[in-house]
Amino acid sequence: MELEDGVVYQEEPGGSGAVMSERVSGLAGSIYREFERLIGRYDEEVVKELMPLVVAVLENLDSVFAQDQEHQVELELLRDDNEQLITQYEREKALRKHAEEKFIEFEDSQEQEKKDLQTRVESLESQTRQLELKAKNYADQISRLEEREAELKKEYNALHQRHTEMIHNYMEHLERTKLHQLSGSDQLESTAHSRIRKERPISLGIFPLPAGDGLLTPDAQKGGETPGSEQWKFQELSQPRSHTSLKVSNSPEPQKAVEQEDELSDVSQGGSKATTPASTANSDVATIPTDTPLKEENEGFVKVTDAPNKSEISKHIEVQVAQETRNVSTGSAENEEKSEVQAIIESTPELDMDKDLSGYKGSSTPTKGIENKAFDRNTESLFEELSSAGSGLIGDVDEGADLLGMGREVENLILENTQLLETKNALNIVKNDLIAKVDELTCEKDVLQGELEAVKQAKLKLEEKNRELEEELRKARAEAEDARQKAKDDDDSDIPTAQRKRFTRVEMARVLMERNQYKERLMELQEAVRWTEMIRASRENPAMQEKKRSSIWQFFSRLFSSSSNTTKKPEPPVNLKYNAPTSHVTPSVKKRSSTLSQLPGDKSKAFDFLSEETEASLASRREQKREQYRQVKAHVQKEDGRVQAFGWSLPQKYKQVTNGQGENKMKNLPVPVYLRPLDEKDTSMKLWCAVGVNLSGGKTRDGGSVVGASVFYKDVAGLDTEGSKQRSASQSSLDKLDQELKEQQKELKNQEELSSLVWICTSTHSATKVLIIDAVQPGNILDSFTVCNSHVLCIASVPGARETDYPAGEDLSESGQVDKASLCGSMTSNSSAETDSLLGGITVVGCSAEGVTGAATSPSTNGASPVMDKPPEMEAENSEVDENVPTAEEATEATEGNAGSAEDTVDISQTGVYTEHVFTDPLGVQIPEDLSPVYQSSNDSDAYKDQISVLPNEQDLVREEAQKMSSLLPTMWLGAQNGCLYVHSSVAQWRKCLHSIKLKDSILSIVHVKGIVLVALADGTLAIFHRGVDGQWDLSNYHLLDLGRPHHSIRCMTVVHDKVWCGYRNKIYVVQPKAMKIEKSFDAHPRKESQVRQLAWVGDGVWVSIRLDSTLRLYHAHTYQHLQDVDIEPYVSKMLGTGKLGFSFVRITALMVSCNRLWVGTGNGVIISIPLTETNKTSGVPGNRPGSVIRVYGDENSDKVTPGTFIPYCSMAHAQLCFHGHRDAVKFFVAVPGQVISPQSSSSGTDLTGDKAGPSAQEPGSQTPLKSMLVISGGEGYIDFRMGDEGGESELLGEDLPLEPSVTKAERSHLIVWQVMYGNE
């Protein structure tokens, strides 16, 4: 970008590349000419003192002018940034406006649809309300009609009762008159003796029945008042009245009359009768059929004329009794009585409405009628009463009776009653019309109210819509005003872009905040790249400023060409010192074409990892590292009162002790004895993991030792078994407890039986190799071979079979002691066909491994090729592994997400026995004979391979038997990132893979407990392997213990006594390997994202480290109590300087407890050793001190006890920092027994400069024997924090190392070995 003033890019004739502006160069030229004139006129001495001052002034002027140019460049960049931000803001604003318009249109359409649906709902609701109103009105009309019908029935019954009472009174009056008139007559005197007069017939006047009738006997015959010869003189009606049918005669419309009849009752063949209800309003005629045809012939018909209008009773009622031809003995008097009865019936209107003509039932109880209990008579039917009175009485009454006067009164009453009824009917009609009118008006009122409500709702909606339209109108006006303002602003195009006010302060603040967030995310990504590759920072190369500083001197040096040798070079100015995170813009020789190239240095370093690393960038990075370590060196060399000895920074307490105690303290310090790159030949090798070889074990269950083809037995084992028998026979519980405690202590000692051999897993881009070294002579690589193409993430040394191992076939539910029987007798086959598929959350997996039995007997030669040892399936799997894995820690973190992509994985949801045909046993692979010399000539390794097993030149039988029992002997287990598990022998034929299997996910950790190997997978499951019946490891049948869902990686495991602690996310699960169950789980950190990364156990405590955390946590091994927190970040910052150097953020990448010390390795290569304090120690060795507390812990699930040792507290006040460190993360610590320098060799107490330095001499009077341990740390690169990068390469401890360029040597994988002398306590 061309500026107004212009930047001159020019080259000096000497090629120095210095740049000077035109003004400064012009000034320099004029001063140069003036100086020439002065020298020509006077002498050089005149300007000799003036020259440095003028040069300094010109340099300052040039630097100021350069700064001015830089500021102008920055200003232009900021203007471009501002322009881009404004353009992006306008685009985003337009897009947002478009989206808001779309949203408004969609909202309007939705609102319209919603309104239509609401209108339909309201119309349906109004229709529903109208229908409900109509139904309600109809129901009201029905109820009113029912009430009216009930009222009419009540009025009818009342009139009927009144009419009956009037008739009764009238008949009584007639009887009294007749009896009074006929009381003196002779006829009555002669006939009075022949009958018994009754004042009144019994209620329900019942006819006497002939003897031949099958009907029931009435109540009147029970009284015995009527003799059989006088049966009321009513033999003319030979049938009872109940068998008489009243039929309508002389009716012009017989059909209509019959339709009006209501057949009220029937008489069955037995003579029973169902009666008419009392609520019947009409006076219906009852038709009573007869039982037999004979009775029908003898039946009398009474035909009653019934007019349509039942209220008119003034018509003639003719009753005609038809008699059939039969023998009757009836006199003329009786015929007269019959005609009188007919006349009375004719003048009695109630016979037209008689309901009780068929009132016989199976009993004498009346079924209907009004019964007057005071007179014990029937007050309803006059006909029944007269029928029972006899014809003589009626004849007596008829004589001299005047019926006309009373008949008129009755007719008048009936006529008046009829008129009243008509009036009432007319009123009822008017009333019903009015009620119907009221109903219609009510219905119309409800409909109008509904319409009014709908109109009100419509009015409210219209008002709301009106308000919305007004609001939209206001918004439209505001937008139009904004548009006018914007058009007015657009006219002011001469205003610069930075001064245009197009957005508010809030919007600008939001944009700036988003930019800052993006910057923070960019810096986080940059930090991640620094962690995974190396800590990067783009800093200016001081060489450019050196050249710029010397360019003016070059320009003016021509003045002193004759006296340049004698002129003293002035010191550089103070203001041009090196600035670490510089932000200067230095114009370079090459012309840069992009805007990014002119960004300041702190911006351009954010993008430097995207470009390829050139030699210049590597050089600048090394220069930056060198400057960083130079500042660390300056900080370390400050006098802070700490003691430096053997490469360690010790606390001040070592000064305060006496000479004897000081030597005793100094002798326990770790002394560095070896330091060198891991492999001189392969410089790209990266360290992953390492472990010391445990060569113990290889015993049968009764203590016998397995060597070659024969089995030898120890006498100690026999004594031990006899002692166990005696112990089991003993009844003393104290003896059992004592023996258990002794066994626990013996197992603790057995765990420390290691050899000095170390297996180190390294990887290149193509494959993973195993290097086997002896810690006593680390420079001599005993053997190296390739394992697989994937990264080996973990390695474990598994001892051989011991007599204390758990039996392989022991049931899971057993919790007793281990049976000391023979190996084969106590083990049962654990094949997939015989075990349960799921044991309480444990999945049993069975793999058919072809060639297992055949591989044990097939002889094979030594020195097998690593490629030949792998089956074809394994090679196919390993070839697909990603090779670009940054570092060990990040790669193991990445396995949680992407390790599940390996093929042929087993479905986790499938329960039951798995049958995996993935790998065959590599023992079955035949090895060519011509490869055997490779094995024999491999770095003099036979001396180490011959510790237990055989040499290549022994007999074939011995070799075969050794191969059979090789898995019974100590082995090495390697877990790869692709899920492959490899088992190699650790005693002989190291290259040969004895067993292998492909598991479901990446293998992150392997531990061994008493004949059980637990393998932690990245999917949150534990694979548990046991030995087979022959003592060899059976990888074809194993158990899977799921730690729960969701599945996450099991990052780390450690053995704590007889249990295994597993780090699973932020939790720690305690697993019992024998029972294969989870005993306890607790949180090691409150946040779920913080994963447990390392576990280290000693005594009764377990130290825990958390990912991306600098705090160590101590937990009790038995009670799981949180005991202590130790933060190492303040200590590291104090020892190595401020946080600008990248040392403030401390990640713990390696953790180990050894030699009564806690060894901590960090992500930036710092190694810290913290002595474990003895203040809280309960008992060192139980029972060796009188009066000391012996702590014993019991298991709540069994009667097992565990001896308490001590709790490994530590304090950062006693922490010791090692000046020997790595340039990148510390990958591992390994502690093995061994001694490089003798304890008698003494040194001057200064720091170590060669292999001959060592700890102070042991006192002759000290009686505690000292053990020597070698502690190995591995990591990328080496740095001495006291020396920085200047002499770090020259101080590598090793005598025969060839000198190589520091560019590659200082950044290779290095091993650092310390020797530690410590006592038994």
Curated annotation (Swiss-Prot):
Sequence ranges assigned to domain RH2 in this UniProt record: 500-571
Acidic residues composition-biased segments: 874-883
Record bears the keyword Transport: no
Annotated tissue distribution: Expressed only in testis on the round spermatids of stage I, II and II. Absent in spermatogonia and spermatocyte.
Chief localization: cytoplasm
Function comment: The JNK-interacting protein (JIP) group of scaffold proteins selectively mediates JNK signaling by aggregating specific components of the MAPK cascade to form a functional JNK signaling module. Regulates lysosomal positioning by acting as an adapter protein which links PIP4P1-positive lysosomes to the dynein-dynactin complex. Assists PIKFYVE selective functionality in microtubule-based endosome-to-TGN trafficking.
Alphabetical list of PANTHER family matching this protein: C-JUN-AMINO-TERMINAL KINASE-INTERACTING PROTEIN 4, JNK/SAPK-ASSOCIATED PROTEIN
Protein name: C-Jun-amino-terminal kinase-interacting protein 4
